Amino acid sequence: MQDPRLLMGKPVRERILEEVRSVTEKVDRIGKLVSISIGDVPEVAVYVRNQARAASTAGLPFDQEFWGADVTQDECKAMIQKMNDDPEVLGIILQRPVPDHINVRSLQSAIHPLKDVEGMNPASIGNIVYNDVAMAPCTAAAAVELIRETGLKLEGLEVVMVGHSEIVGKPAAMMLMAEGATVTVCHHLTRSVAMHSRRADVIVVAVGKAHLIGADMVKPGAAVIDIGINQITEADGNTRIVGDVDTDAVKEIAGWVTPVPGGVGPVTVAILMRNAVRAHERQKAAGWYA
């Protein structure tokens, strides 16, 4: 029997994909999602496969583009511009990591905001400041979605965000503030993360440091959303994926904790599909379709 304190992503993923499919089934014509992979990065294949599977479930066409590791920045931008101009392309997904000579932020900026289904264009992230979260960064939006899943009322909630990256920590903090939560953001210069986390109703952690959050840093009954992904080597030499939270210890104290893997990840992919139908709605409102 599954531990009820584990906040699993799969049911949330399935609900969101079902909602997306209910929209796509009513649309006469919808463009395709295009995944761009640059260079040969084996771990990217897993993400692309998960996205393709989710797109199929949601009723969204999905294409894959593979660009060689020797492609130039200018060539990438030119190909992205062609996709921006192509009415058959609904949204563009830029897989990461990319080769060292490619400036990923520049390419994210090159994607038209209305085709930015990942929510990575600076315009998309900037919109969150104005409480426009329709196409927010997927991982940040997934964290907020999982907090909602607990049933906790966001208004007035004490939330501690551990990590302040541009694509997760900062957007998630702004999204939670837009919902009325009181948000404290901790980072590598914070003197005592534990001092803040112990008073939090919700802890969201995304720093990439295995088992950073232990049971002694969590208030009884709190919700803990773990976005971290780390590979550790066990004493027997085997490797495994863990989060930023010591899940086994923390679940004895917390009311909810997302496991890694199986927590935020599945929801992130579903949010990508939800962003896609929102992109379609905004493109239609902008007069892109006859």
UniProtKB/Swiss-Prot annotation:
Q: Might you give the EC number(s) for this enzyme?
A: 1.5.1.5, 3.5.4.9
Which SUPFAM superfamilies does UniProt cross-reference here?
Answer: Aminoacid dehydrogenase-like, N-terminal domain (SSF53223), NAD(P)-binding Rossmann-fold domains (SSF51735)
Q: Which UniProt keywords apply?
A: Amino-acid biosynthesis, Histidine biosynthesis, Hydrolase, Methionine biosynthesis, Multifunctional enzyme, NADP, One-carbon metabolism, Oxidoreductase, Purine biosynthesis
Gene3D superfamilies xref list = Leucine Dehydrogenase, chain A, domain 1 (3.40.50.10860), NAD(P)-binding Rossmann-like Domain (3.40.50.720)
* Protein's GO biological process: L-histidine biosynthetic process; methionine biosynthetic process; purine nucleotide biosynthetic process; tetrahydrofolate interconversion
Pfam families assigned to the protein according to its UniProt record, in alphabetical order: THF_DHG_CYH (PF00763), THF_DHG_CYH_C (PF02882)
* Coiled-coil regions listed: none
**Which pathway does the record list?**
One-carbon metabolism; tetrahydrofolate interconversion
Any idea which GO molecular function terms this record carries?
A: methenyltetrahydrofolate cyclohydrolase activity; methylenetetrahydrofolate dehydrogenase (NADP+) activity
Catalysed reaction, written as an equation: (6R)-5,10-methylene-5,6,7,8-tetrahydrofolate + NADP(+) = (6R)-5,10-methenyltetrahydrofolate + NADPH; (6R)-5,10-methenyltetrahydrofolate + H2O = (6R)-10-formyltetrahydrofolate + H(+)
- Cellular component terms (Gene Ontology): cytosol
Residues that hold NADP(+) according to the record:
163-165, 229
Give the protein's function.
Answer: Catalyzes the oxidation of 5,10-methylenetetrahydrofolate to 5,10-methenyltetrahydrofolate and then the hydrolysis of 5,10-methenyltetrahydrofolate to 10-formyltetrahydrofolate.
Relate the assembly described in the record.
Homodimer.
> PANTHER family from the entry?
C-1-TETRAHYDROFOLATE SYNTHASE, CYTOPLASMIC, C-1-TETRAHYDROFOLATE SYNTHASE, CYTOPLASMIC-RELATED
Against HAMAP family, the record matches this protein to: THF_DHG_CYH
Can you tell me which family this protein belongs to?
Belongs to the tetrahydrofolate dehydrogenase/cyclohydrolase family.
**Name assigned to this protein:** Bifunctional protein FolD 3
- What organism is recorded for this protein? Roseobacter denitrificans (strain ATCC 33942 / OCh 114)
